[in-house]
Amino acid sequence: MRDETPAYLRARHYFYEILESQAQTSRMGVIVNRFIVFFIVLSVGITVMESVPAMREDYGRLFQALELLCLVMFSIEYYIRIWIAPEHLPYHHMSPLRAAWAYMISPQGIVDCISVMPLWIALFGPDDLRVLIILRMLRLLKFARYSSGMRSLLEVLESERRALMACLVILACATLVSATAMHIAEGHVQPEKFGTIPDAMWWAIVTLSTIGYGDVVPATGIGRMVASATIICGLIMIALPVGIVANAFSEVIHRRDFIVNWSMVARVPLFSHLTAGDIAHIMQLLQARQIERGEVVFRRGEPATAMYFIAEGDVEIELGPEDKGRRIRLGTGHFFGEIAVLKRVERSATVKAVSRTRLLVLDGADLRALIAREPSIARKINQIVEGRTGRNLNLEIADLEGQADVSVEENA
């Protein structure tokens, strides 16, 4: 059936997939992400090199041209992200204008706006080099979108903010107590360094952080005892937040970028009859993907590029009008998306996550190559699909194997 969605909505969703939902899984999304990261690094590198007078004098025009190119690229990205804002799950219920505004005032939207501000300042504002340098360096914050590690770290800081705030309060108390004790012990001996509690706080902060510049040291026995206690306290102060962040960071990384392991693949019923060697081979083909509750895996009418296995969680399949809009719910161990891949047609259903779901993604070309290697998989797919939908794939096993042979030849 022909997709009646307006062309501009299809285009908007396409760009949303490239920049957001499939930025880490689709080939085009990965290319665009790397392209943007390249311009972030280039822009920051130009800012650093421009601070060297000799390089600014010799390559000033080149730096200006490259900076203008970076600004143009960041501006295009920013305007596209404003346009695709209604595609974001939290903004689905909003009008396009409200969704665009919600994105613009979000933390990521503000960072994207800062990235293009040097262009606006250069065109309409004062030529203040210090302001431009600061704004250019703030582009490093864009890495939070393109680096899963930075996103995970920000998530950890957000989730553990109360514990970290408690550590900060304890550190402030320890600093004040240490500074007061050192002021009492050393204030009369070194009045220029410990004459007041605020003066002594510099020493306390440096000592508690275990940096120890050595510019201020105690001269009395009591002062050394206070310093020893402060050093031991500093080790504890550093260990507390480090342990909290490290443990939470490990949990977030495991939850977000889970590893495709042998037991995970072996639990999938479609692969349960295979040998250990075959499962090890399939492990190399599968990619891990985690989606949140309500997130769309793919929509009806989109090109089919991969099939999916549910490692954990649940999804809901909304079939098309030819199936009277019937909905099917699948859980852990099931698979979906194989029909369109094997028939080389567009998606006939829309799939959404019912809960936080971990998926194993198998590329269409790899699926056909796998069928050529293990024909029993094709037979089992036919059986499972027929039991699920009440109809056969209408593809003979020989046809599937033939498609696999063609795919292998194309990739050779």
UniProtKB/Swiss-Prot annotation:
Its subcellular locations are: Cell membrane
What broad class describes the main subcellular location of this protein? membrane
The sequence motif named Selectivity filter is recorded at: 210-215
Q: What is this protein called?
A: Putative potassium channel protein RPA4233
Species name: Rhodopseudomonas palustris (strain ATCC BAA-98 / CGA009)
| Binding residues for a nucleoside 3',5'-cyclic phosphate | 270-388
- SUPFAM superfamilies recorded: cAMP-binding domain-like (SSF51206), Voltage-gated potassium channels (SSF81324)
Cellular component GO terms, alphabetical: voltage-gated potassium channel complex
Topology term for the membrane: Multi-pass membrane protein
> What UniProt keywords are attached to this protein's entry?
Cell membrane, Ion channel, Ion transport, Membrane, Potassium, Potassium channel, Potassium transport, Transmembrane, Transmembrane helix, Transport
